[in-house]
Amino acid sequence: MSITLKIAKEEDKEFWNGLVENSPHGTIFHTWKFLKIVEKHTNSKLYPILGLKGTTPIGIYPLFLQKRFFTRLVFSPPPRAVLLYLGPLLVSYDKLKQSKRESIFVEFQKKLNEFLKSEIKYNYVRIRTSPRFIDARPFLWTGYRVEPLYTYIIDISKGSEQVWKNFNKQVRMDINKTKREGVKVKEGSIDDLKFLSKSIANRFIEQGFRSRDYRRYLDDVYKAFHPEKFRIFVGEYNGETVGGLTLLCYKKRASLWMGIPKTDLKGIYPNDLIVWESIKWACESGYKEYEIMDAGDDPRLRHFKSKFNPDLSLWYSAEKYSSSIYKGMEKVFRFYQKIRG
């Protein structure tokens, strides 16, 4: 029996979320609520694709369509959402034999490609898989250009004391000094999102991207997921907020999502302390992994993130053009991606 595709509807959201929960690669970004928030804030149309064999689900594939001028661009995830990855999920992937994994994924991707061509009539598509979804061959075999990317994940299953011992010695010294100088870390509220949104916008400007106000987007994520799956940590020094981060919590992993803006303070390291306090919180809350989200495409970020002694975790970006004409416009697409985020 071949795989068929179905566009999920609002009444399918609990069924959809169950499939995300049942996939070893499912992330909070794949959940129905998060997808709808992203659709709202990115000027995109969501296509939540269900893959079925008969009535049995085999996977999901969230896609976002954006129309720009005369082009139809498909993303998973879309620009301007500050999501590193999304892409397909296969149900019970870790429980399948390798031959079964391959046959399902290959057919699922072929069906998806047919849908992109016949129904969406795409000109460009970019898919970014979630961490540890390591089989990129079905993309390669169907004409995609594939690029490896990397995020950072710390094993915190043995507790905060072991995590602390594994840190770079200099980081431990900097954290202790920052505490002695009087920087305090606390859990933040929705009011702290204004500081974080402004800091993130400034950082994008510094990196050559167009400024964007993420306040309403972050507010919606906060209202949908706080406190169970969304936390804020902020650092204060001499009565002022000097740093902060947002933490997404799903399954066994807590992930540093947005935050840790560059600070001009000399001799103290509030971002290091905030990361450490959020790691301790994650340990105490029963999480087994702490992710410092990264794409691995900006070497400037390596120095900050690697000093916490994380492990590299592989994921992929796969992209494809509908024809050589649009392939020839690659520089235009690259410029569009840069200015849109």
Role assignments for model-derived ranges:
Residues 3-71, 130-267:
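A conserved beta-strand-loop-helix scaffold within acyl/acetyltransferase catalytic domains
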Residues 50-57, 94, 219-328:
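Aromatic (often tryptophan-rich) hydrophobic motifs at membrane interfaces
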Residues 65, 131-132, 140-162, 287-341:
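Active-site/acyl-donor-binding loops of N-acyltransferases
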Residues 65-87:
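Conserved acyl-donor/pantetheine-binding loop and adjacent beta-alpha core of acyl/acetyltransferases
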Residues 79-90, 146-153:
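Acyl/amide activation-and-transfer machinery of modular secondary-metabolite enzymes
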Residues 85-100, 157-158, 259-268:
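A short, internal acetyl-CoA/4′-phosphopantetheine-binding micro-motif in the GNAT/acyltransferase core
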Residues 103-148:
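Non-catalytic accessory segments adjacent to catalytic cores
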Residues 125-126, 186, 288-293:
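Short catalytic-loop micro-motif centered on adjacent basic/acidic residues
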